[in-house]
Amino acid sequence: MSNGQSVKAVAKYVRISPHKVRQVLDQIRGRSYQEALMILEFLPYDAGSPIWQVVHSVAANAKNNYNLDKKKLVISEIFADEGPKLKRIRPRAQGRAYKILKPTCHITVVVKSIS
């Protein structure tokens, strides 16, 4: 893998708020692959599970597609973008309806190999 090349994985339409996901992402940004997995495994947040899956997936992409060693991977970029909102309604008194917005997000992880 040359200096400019990186390996990427994306989880789309994850049914959790991007704000909640970003709180967890900030804790693993810039860390090694193994360190990030360890942190994610023991965090008390629900956002840890989908992030763990994406980090695991990007490492598998690096190993299978580029023959990189998982022990040398470092998370160079990790971010959560806002996805579409699921629109639902809550019935209220006198025939009214309140809108419920259920947010989704897209989680992107980019890793680079250190030599």
From Swiss-Prot:
InterPro entries, per database record: Ribosomal_uL22 (IPR001063), Ribosomal_uL22_bac/chlpt-type (IPR005727), Ribosomal_uL22_bac/org-type (IPR047867), Ribosomal_uL22_CS (IPR018260), Ribosomal_uL22_sf (IPR036394)
Pfam families: Ribosomal_L22 (PF00237)
Main location: plastid
MF GO annotations: rRNA binding; structural constituent of ribosome
GO CC annotations, alphabetized: chloroplast; large ribosomal subunit
Alphabetized UniProt keyword annotations: Chloroplast, Plastid, Ribonucleoprotein, Ribosomal protein, RNA-binding, rRNA-binding
GO biological process terms on file: translation
Subcellular location, record wording: Plastid, Chloroplast
Domain of life, per lineage: Eukaryota
Function: This protein binds specifically to 23S rRNA. The globular domain of the protein is located near the polypeptide exit tunnel on the outside of the subunit, while an extended beta-hairpin is found that lines the wall of the exit tunnel in the center of the 70S ribosome.
UniProt-listed NCBIfam families: rplV_bact
Summary of subunit composition and partner proteins: Part of the 50S ribosomal subunit.
Annotated family: Belongs to the universal ribosomal protein uL22 family.
Record protein name field: Large ribosomal subunit protein uL22c
Taxonomy of the source species: Eukaryota, Sar, Stramenopiles, Ochrophyta, Bacillariophyta
Encoding gene (name): rpl22
